[in-house]
Amino acid sequence: MRIGISGLQTTDLVAKSIKETLSDAGFESFYFKNNSKATLADLVIVLGGDRGVRNYLHSAIDVDTPVLGISESESNGVLAQIELKELPSYLNRIKKQDYVIEDVPRIGVKIDGKNTYPVLNDVSVFTSKSATLMEHILRINGEEVWHDSSDGVIISTPIGSSAYSMSAGGPIIFQAANVFGIIS
């Protein structure tokens, strides 16, 4: 199994340490900063906590390689669920393929008719002038299902539901739910 190692803020020392740990466990690994190389891996370890995983997923648009998010500090997150010091204990499970791959829903966005990268947390649309109402319509398959006026709208994935949308009064959405939150 080939494991790619990615992380924008990762020091060479940390990457070298992880490569050694993986090599000792019998894995072939390589460090990359250009996400086009992610397709060469069977699994990608992303360092830098939730922020590192978000950054990686935003730039790895067409990559379907499973990701293991690792926090380099003492705190776990939603996307980076293990700490760096725990990696050796997880390698045996990786070898046996004793893990579950979860699909993470993202929101496709077009700005001025051009696709942007798929959004992991949320999309916010506001007027350019503060305290000004805007009108928005939600259409699904061309059919209008919702019409509202407000100073903005937030569309959130389940992962993003515990971030900005929650602070705007939106619900926390169960991670496995196949829905988006719309907060107006």
Annotated model-derived regions:
Residues 46-48, 69-71, 156:
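Short beta-strand segments
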Residues 64-68:
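Proline-centered loop/turn at the N-terminus of a beta-strand
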Residues 147-184:
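Gly/Ser/Thr-rich active-site loops/lids in small-molecule metabolic enzymes
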Residues 49-52, 73, 159-162:
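Short glycine-rich anion-binding loops that position phosphate/pyrophosphate groups of nucleotides
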Residues 1-47, 52-62, 82-103, 110-117:
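ATP/NTP phosphate-donor binding region
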